[in-house]
Amino acid sequence: METVKNIFGGLVDFFASIPASLLNTFRSANGFGDIYTAFARWIFILLALFILLKSIMSLLKSKNPSEVWAYLNIGPYINVPLKHWENILGRARSCDVQIDDMSVSRAHGTLTRDNDGVWRYMDLGSKNGASLNGHRIASNSEVELKAGDSLMLGKVECTLYPISIEERRNNIRHRAHDTVLVSPWPSLVALTIFQVMTVIQLMVGLGKAYNQQITISFAGICILMWSYVIVLRGMRRKGFEMEIIAFFLSTLSLAVTASSLPNQVFKQFITVAMGVGLFFFMCTWLRELPRTIRIKNVVYALAVVLFLLNVVFGHSQNGATNWIKIGGLTIQPSDLVKLAFIWVGAASLDELFEKKNTLIFTVFSVFSFGCLALMRDLGTATIFFVTFLIISFLRSGDLTKIIVIAGVAAVAGIVALRFKKYAMARIEVWGHVWDPEFINATGFQMTRSMTASASGGFVGLGAGEGWLRKQFASETDLVFALVTEEWGLIIAILMVFAILTLSVFAYRSILSGRSTYYTIAACSAMSIFLFQTMLNVFGTLDIFPLTGVTFPFVSAGGTSMIASWGLLAFLKSADTRQNASFAVSLKDRGIGESPEL
């Protein structure tokens, strides 16, 4: 009984002391600031949960619909629906259309559709060849295939038939039924409130260090995101989940930049605007596959020029010679080359069977690795190599070959590290940062980042209130720790979960991809997002060696921000949901067609 009495007495004393504590807080020099931060930290979490979970759940619930585009009649009895724009015809089980006849080669030919609905057949050097309406088709040459034409594959006759009007109606209905698009307006309002409250919090946290660049930058990103959504809604687009996630992460980027480098925040906003511009341009360009493939040689040339400029004129920073100074700007060309690497590495179905195409990409990859080795950029080289493995596997499907390449590269990497003292020092300190000989030396950054992460707790100290922001590279390499300290573990985890969701959605989009080009591009961009996030987060926590890799959309840095928006364009191009992506032309989705047709 005495124990219960003491407990209730303690509770009464606690609540009785609250008014006095609040009064003392308001009387203190920063009374309003302390009260605002105390409440704002919880409101930030609620807003972040609403913004991100609303978009995340929409992406995870949505299905990229699988549609029937035509039928291929094989022999007298078999009728196969064509559910992709690119199909391999052959005897092998892995073919999109399997023809069980010994006169048909394992991979006999390809049947592809373009934006205008025209189907084309290309023979892949099959043993018994192919003919169209009695005319022999030359190996590796394309011919147009019309409805009712007789296509002979070996001794098997095939005929292409269009879908009926009723089936076309059903396609449109099913697409609309499978598409779950949430209204962007509540999320935009919540994100706007988040941005306004962040500005107030930065005023409180930074004090005299606060400047008008911060106000202008947050006003700019607010206007930018509203303008983007309004313009796209005017174009009859309704799916904005990916962009809202990216705008939220970009808002955090402005916040961490303002916290660490208040005088650089406007420059960071400009790169966000440039990134959105690049995203819009790439999505518009990628919607036309032939046009996308035609400029591959131009993209190759630009990538080579960027690498050569970096090798010749680059200057060393943090152990890597991967920066170029142009006036007052410092850029990292390798971030932009990631986009080129995916652009030229992705391939349409016809290109997958061209040895010349594969050889050129392999030579370019070796050239890229060589340049990155000269620049001593271990983190970027690792990302490029993982992307190369992903692209190579998706292009060939040969897992054994990929394992051999990875094994040889791992051995070569270990040998190379022996000659790179800076990189080797990071490897040696890995897992031992708390040892006396490392804690204030090569382990300095990681021990401080882990300490700051722990001090943030679940809700954080408040933007501009942390101490890690004063440490070197806190806004780039250690940004996960900075976000955890100032914004809390909950928002930091949501930040990671947002990247994971983009990747999961890209993976689910593969099944309904219009072309292998978009599938390979989306998977490659997904792998870069995932691997960069993993290296940044785990490097900060000493689970992986610290590589200096940025967190997508969040880390400060112009080229990193621009490249992140560019990578998002590859994911957006794989989104075939009804009205969701302007990377897909309206006529390909049944938009504008009345249900009665």
List each model region and its residues:
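A structural signal for hydrophobic alpha-helical transmembrane segments in multi-pass membrane proteins
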Residues: 173-318, 562-576, 580-589
